[in-house]
């Protein structure tokens, strides 16, 4: 067990506090909204003909965390923790970008949400999830690996742990 967890929390204490402050609670599950997002993404085709991939891993994340704007509840370990929202429509027009990165990673990616500035909600990076549940961020400086699953990614974003930069080779 990690030292900053209690026996009753799924997440580290500061991550759990941020999630609960945003409206999350254990058992939260809005599959109806998740399916609406899935249908919207499936129906969208870019002018270049690119379409979104929708995976069960993405739908499950949207059902549990969708619609939440999550802000950190304390200082970061090594970086300033991120404020973000889980809303796949933030990536509606990013089908080609996600397809290109997915091809490089030999997987398929689906939009998850976006990192924002804490005070203005201006987008800073696109959050994406692959078919295995791994989570990534894509911004103007590059592509980043946030964790092997949504729990690890939330911890990375909210704790100020550095993400892993994706590089060629």
Enumerate the predicted regions with their spans.
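A surface-exposed partner-binding patch
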Residues: 1-123
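Short, surface-exposed charged micro-motifs
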Residues: 125-127
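Short acidic-glycine loop/turn motifs at beta-strand connectors
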Residues: 129-132
